[in-house]
């Protein structure tokens, strides 16, 4: 399971290690040839963080989010914590939160989560949180991997199976996220989030059938 998860979430971000190489690396400790240390650490860190989160039950917090991010990027990027400079997500064509307001927007997101965690279905709650996190883009690098790990944590914490965002469905995934961009940080209209929620629901079904059955 974890091999498929690590392969897909890192491949979405451009990691070129294929599934067989990922399996050999994580199961047998065999380092793939002609791959960068960054790509190798990327997979190893994902596996380590995933297993560490299975043992945790605490509520979302700035500390937990930063810890997940920093652990995912260990030996990859030395920049720790929320970013202090602006970024533009060119490939996705949207402007992230300006650096001076990252902490403020993350505060608002955590407050939104706390307010809605008892009145939204866990899949809907986790999906909307994931999107809003990605829209803020609070880190210099690793936002996608961190966001998908948080999505996984929120589902597992509520006794739901995790989701693979498959490499082959990357375009649909990113398109659904962009549709949801029309909602601001403290709101979540059904029209804006319907597609990404439906996408994640289908990915959950596919993950369950492909991995657990």
What are these regions (language model features)?
Residues 1-213:
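FIC/Doc superfamily catalytic core
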């Amino acid at each position: 399971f974890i091999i498929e998860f690590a392969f897909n979430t890192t491949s979405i971000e451009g990691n070129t290690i294929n599934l067989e190489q990922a399996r050999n690396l994580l199961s047998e400790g065999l380092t793939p040839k002609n791959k960068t240390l960054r790509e190798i650490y990327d997979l190893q860190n994902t596996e380590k963080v995933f297993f560490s989160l299975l043992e945790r039950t605490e509520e979302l917090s700035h500390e937990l989010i930063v810890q997940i991010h920093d652990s995912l990027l260990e030996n990859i990027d030395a920049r720790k914590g929320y970013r202090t400079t602006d970024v533009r997500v060119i490939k996705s064509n949207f402007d992230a939160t300006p650096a001076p307001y990252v902490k403020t927007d993350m505060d608002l997101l955590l407050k939104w989560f706390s307010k809605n965690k008892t009145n939204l279905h866990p899949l809907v709650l986790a999906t909307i949180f994931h999107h809003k996190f990605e829209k803020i883009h609070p880190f210099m690098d690793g936002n996608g991997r961190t966001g998908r790990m948080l999505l996984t944590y929120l589902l597992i914490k509520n006794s739901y199976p995790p989701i693979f965002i498959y490499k082959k469905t990357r375009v649909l995934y990113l398109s659904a996220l962009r549709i949801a961009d029309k909602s601001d940080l403290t709101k979540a209209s059904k029209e804006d989030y319907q597609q990404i929620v439906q996408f994640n629901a289908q990915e959950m079904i596919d993950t369950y059938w492909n991995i657990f059955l």
